[in-house]
Amino acid sequence: MNWDQVEGNWKQLKGKAKQKWGKFTDDELDVLSGKKDELVGKLQEKYGMAKDKAEQEAELWREAC
């Protein structure tokens, strides 16, 4: 699944994101809307990840979807 597909199916996928990253609130997940850059930024903010680590986490999650 590519990022365009993630965005298009975000309502179905945000539950998986919530399971993976439990610190995200439902409102934060709604705002992310499946956008990679938004997700990476939120991972950096909530989990204190470096940008490259957050990008890697986002990609691994996308590939598992």
Language-model regions, residue ranges each:
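Intrinsically disordered, low-complexity, hydrophilic segments
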Residues: M1-C65
